């Protein structure tokens, strides 16, 4: 059933579906997907879109914006249906609003009634919680932890790209996977949620950070897979403490 005429749904289309479409159409779909991501995750207020507490905005209002005027409702429907990461959801709405669309997660805007399933016990958490990043960010993450970085949540996947059942949560070209000790973080009061497309979300601590104490292990994914040490943070702290201690002794001797 078409999402405009039935209950809300968010499904990924067949993986081979796009391969049979002309390259220029695929490029337009990528352009539309990126524009939707910005408007629905970050820019709705700036663009003047009326967003509900659940993150939905009227599709008709969206399509009136200059960057969307070359696209139709059918284009949006196709991008929603064929998006393998299930980033967006459509629902019929009512006669006053018409069809509604939202991003399933990834907001920097506050969306207080986004449909998230609380994961309140260790048993409710996936067996694997992993955050994907790039090698250039790893030293900072190892030292300071994972940060929301302007979004409302830190994104985690229930597995590595290509694992069965893993739809979204990390980019397929990530170079480093950071595995999280969810039960330990949960015991310390850090909440976790599951979005409608299976991404695990956490706001982190009061500072919006998931500290390194919750890292179980780290894995370099490319160019070859190999374990990464978690000792770097402890070594740096030890070196810093030793430097301060030596400096203090030198001042005392003077």
Swiss-Prot record:
Keywords, alphabetical: Acetylation, NAD, Transferase, tRNA processing
N-acetylmethionine: modified positions: 1
InterPro entries in the cross-refs: Ptrans_KptA/Tpt1 (IPR002745), RNA_2'-PTrans_C (IPR042081), RNA_2'-PTrans_N (IPR042080)
Catalytic activity: 2'-phospho-[ligated tRNA] + NAD(+) = mature tRNA + ADP-alpha-D-ribose 1'',2''-cyclic phosphate + nicotinamide
Compositionally skewed regions (Basic and acidic residues) per UniProt: 233-244
One of the GO BP terms on file: tRNA splicing, via endonucleolytic cleavage and ligation
Enzyme Commission identifier(s): 2.7.1.160
UniProt superkingdom: Eukaryota
One example GO MF annotation: tRNA 2'-phosphotransferase activity
Matches recorded under Pfam families: PTS_2-RNA (PF01885)
Disordered, as annotated region: 1-30, 225-254
Similarity comment text for this entry: Belongs to the KptA/TPT1 family.
The protein's role, per its UniProt record: Catalyzes the last step of tRNA splicing, the transfer of the splice junction 2'-phosphate from ligated tRNA to NAD to produce ADP-ribose 1''-2'' cyclic phosphate.
Protein name: tRNA 2'-phosphotransferase 1
Organism field: Bos taurus
Gene expressing this chain: TRPT1
């Amino acid at each position: 059933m078409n999402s405009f005429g039935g209950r809300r749904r968010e499904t990924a289309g067949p993986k081979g579906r796009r391969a049979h479409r002309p390259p220029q159409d695929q490029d337009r779909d990528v352009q539309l997907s990126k524009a939707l991501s910005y408007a629905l995750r970050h820019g709705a207020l700036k663009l003047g879109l009326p967003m509900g507490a659940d993150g939905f905005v009227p599709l008709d209002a969206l399509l009136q914006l200059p960057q969307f005027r070359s696209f139709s409702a059918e284009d949006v429907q196709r991008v929603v249906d064929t998006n393998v990461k299930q980033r967006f959801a459509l629902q019929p709405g009512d006669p006053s609003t018409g069809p509604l669309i939202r991003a399933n997660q990834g907001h920097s805007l506050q969306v207080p009634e986004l449909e998230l399933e609380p994961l309140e016990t260790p048993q409710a958490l996936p067996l694997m919680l992993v955050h994907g990043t790039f090698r250039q960010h790893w030293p900072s993450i190892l030292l300071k932890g994972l940060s929301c970085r302007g979004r409302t949540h830190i994104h985690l996947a229930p597995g590595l790209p290509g694992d069965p059942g893993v739809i979204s949560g990390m980019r397929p070209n990530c170079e480093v996977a950071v595995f999280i000790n969810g039960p330990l973080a949960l015991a310390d009061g850090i909440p976790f949620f599951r979005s409608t497309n299976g991404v695990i979300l956490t706001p982190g601590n009061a500072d919006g950070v998931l500290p390194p104490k919750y890292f179980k292990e780290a894995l370099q994914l490319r160019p070859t897979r190999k374990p990464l040490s978690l000792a770097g943070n402890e070594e740096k702290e030890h070196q810093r403490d030793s430097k301060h201690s030596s400096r203090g002794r030198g001042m005392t001797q003077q």
